[in-house]
Curated annotation (Swiss-Prot):
Zn(2+) binds at residue 153. Keywords: Calcium, Capsid protein, Intermediate capsid protein, Metal-binding, Ubl conjugation, Virion, Zinc. This is Intermediate capsid protein VP6. It comes from Rotavirus A (strain RVA/Turkey/Ireland/Ty-1/1978/G7P[17]) (RV-A). One of its GO terms (molecular function) is metal ion binding.
Length: 397
């Protein structure tokens, strides 16, 4: 994989720098690097494809090295160089695609395509440019079973989950109390509601709690916490728990009280925040526990009192909510996030070439299903194919 990255980096730089009119001395270093690539691969043959609808392609290498000149690069020089560079770029692209569409239950971090396995041969180790890519560094570490670390912006660590639970429900469904939530990607919205507005709760205080397990441990996270849950606090028709009826959710928004957010690791509280909104920091955690209260206003104007009667029917739902967003974090496991298109690249290629469902990934690379069952095998394969996708993205920009 590191050889493939070095090839891509060299070819990307060569394509950008070897242009007509450039003084040769300004590009002599990259020309020599390209010549090293040519000398290393000349005489080799490779084959890519042959899975799903991905066509088989045979690659042969017999190129002359790029020459030197005391003058500026002319059109003929650049045209000859581009012919060589473009062929090599097509080859690297095909190797990346061939790697992205393959998976294995055992040792999924290792190259799975014949072409990438062949590039692991010692003769190609002379190809060396710059292996400082975060993905290459982590791939090498994971390959040696050492700790890795990815910096993530809005990590997609939460599987989609939109549901509710009722702690009180009368048969007519006009007097309910419970919580409703939406978890997805890096964001949690949670709302607690009570038709009675805590009228019969102890001390006129209704308490709510929501626990969200992570699928991986996050470290050094920056988190934002805001009152209200705008996606959840709108009028809606909601099915009953048994699915046999529906009820009208008609929220009236109040501000939550006694808000507490706990970040836990293996069941132990690591970081705890009380009555604090805005930007929070969490050292390391694998679950989040959010608790808050709905307090019935002790004093209400006639207009407000009419919203929350003291006897049935109860036409409205007093509602308090919170929104928590994981803005950034580090993780030892590779995840998709807001900064990188690699999940889209991988999914698109597997769909384009009708790659059959294998033993590791779910159909269509369904991210929610993948996270819900994020095994060691999936982690290894995902790290490998995301690394290949990161290399491919360098040369197709």
């Amino acid at each position: 994989m590191d050889v493939l990255y070095s090839l891509a980096k060299t070819l990307k730089d060569a394509r950008a720098r070897i242009v007509e009119g450039t003084l040769y001395t300004n590009v002599a270093d990259i020309v020599q690097q390209v010549n090293q690539v040519i000398n290393s691969i000349n005489g080799s043959t490779f084959q890519t494809g042959g899975i799903g609808n991905l066509p088989i392609r045979n690659w042969t290498f017999d190129f002359g090295t790029l020459g030197t000149t005391l003058l500026n690069l002319d059109a003929n020089y650049v045209e000859n160089a581009r012919t060589t560079i473009d062929y090599f770029i097509d080859f690297v692209d095909s190797v990346c695609v061939d790697e992205i569409v393959r998976e294995s239950q055992r040792n999924g971090i290792a190259p799975q395509s014949d072409s990438l396995r062949q590039l692991s041969n010692a003769k190609y180790k002379r190809i060396n440019y710059d292996n400082e890519s975060e993905y290459i560094e982590n791939w090498n570490l994971q390959n040696r079973r050492q700790r890795t670390g990815y910096l993530l912006h809005k990590p997609n660590i939460l599987p989609y989950n939109n549901s509710f639970t009722l702690t009180r429900s009368q048969p007519a469904h006009d007097n309910v109390c419970g919580t409703i939530w939406l978890n997805n990607g890096s964001e949690i919205e949670i709302a607690g509601f009570d038709s009675e507005c805590a009228l019969n709760a102890p001390g006129n205080i209704q308490e709510f709690e929501h626990v969200v397990p992570m699928r991986r441990v996050l470290n050094n996270a920056t988190v934002s916490l805001l009152p209200y849950a705008p996606r959840l606090t709108q009028r809606a028709v909601i099915p009953t728990a048994d699915g046999l009826n529906t009820w009208l959710f008609n929220p009236i928004i109040l501000r939550p009280n006694n808000v507490q957010v706990e970040f836990l690791l293996n069941g132990q509280v690591i970081t705890n925040y009380q009555a604090r909104y805005g930007i929070l920091a969490a050292r390391n955690f694998d679950s989040i526990r959010i608790s808050f209260q709905l307090v019935r206003p002790p004093n209400m104007t006639p207009g407000v009192a009419a919203l929350f009667p003291v006897a049935a029917p109860f036409p409205n739902h007093a509602t308090v909510g919170l929104t928590l967003k994981i803005e950034s974090a580090s993780c030892e496991s590779v995840l998709s996030d807001a900064n990188e298109p690699y999940l889209s690249i991988v999914t698109g290629l597997r769909q384009e070439y009708a790659i059959p469902v294998g033993p590791v990934f779910p159909a269509g690379m369904n991210w929610t299903e993948l996270l819900n069952n994020y095994s060691a095998s999936r982690e290894d394969n995902l790290q490998r194919i995301f690394t290949a996708a990161s290399i491919r993205s360098m040369i197709i920009k």
